[in-house]
Amino acid sequence: MFRKIFLILLLIFSLQSCSKKEAEYEPQEKISAYKLYQEGLDAFQQGNYFYAEKKFSEAELNFEIVEFAAKSSIMASYSLYGINFYESALDNLERYLKTYPADKNVLYAHYLIALIYYEQISDEKKDLEPLINADKKIDFFLKTYPNSDYAIDLKFKKDLIQNQLAAKELYVAKFYISTQKWVPAINRLKKIIDNYEKTIFIEEALHR
């Protein structure tokens, strides 16, 4: 919760600053876009993410200055994330990355994508796909932005994912051992040793 509030405040501060700049540049031509953005910001601060997303999306279409349109798009995505509309948020973030590839908030967009994939992890015993997808997105971020402030958070999440994946492999290996299927059991244990050497399950895999 603290992390989420921190990110909200960070984004609000950034966008408020840009809105003031925007008003200074062309107040007559841009007043409509600024008004839409401000309505979105007010709704966002009140927790009305549905309405906020609508206004930020409208603001993006009305801003002629690319920097402000891009920031409106980011806020629309974050509003969708706030109401757990994960697929819509991801679609909007992917569109943002294609439309504004040079925007200074691209790093944050990739972080939010990784975060959304991570939060879609439910029961790894039934479905490994969300785990694998989240791991890939987090890995991409860590390789692309290793020194980012967000890297610490994602490294922690990656460690949790790696342990979950290793636990699944060990569970399957134990099943094969119990049924005396030695070759697939060894293959599963080898996978833990090769791919998850930093997890808490490495010692058990080595001693099996």
Say what each PLM segment does.
Residues 5-13:
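Sec-dependent N-terminal signal peptides
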Residues 2, 15-208:
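Acidic, polar-rich low-complexity tracts and alpha-helical solenoid repeat scaffolds
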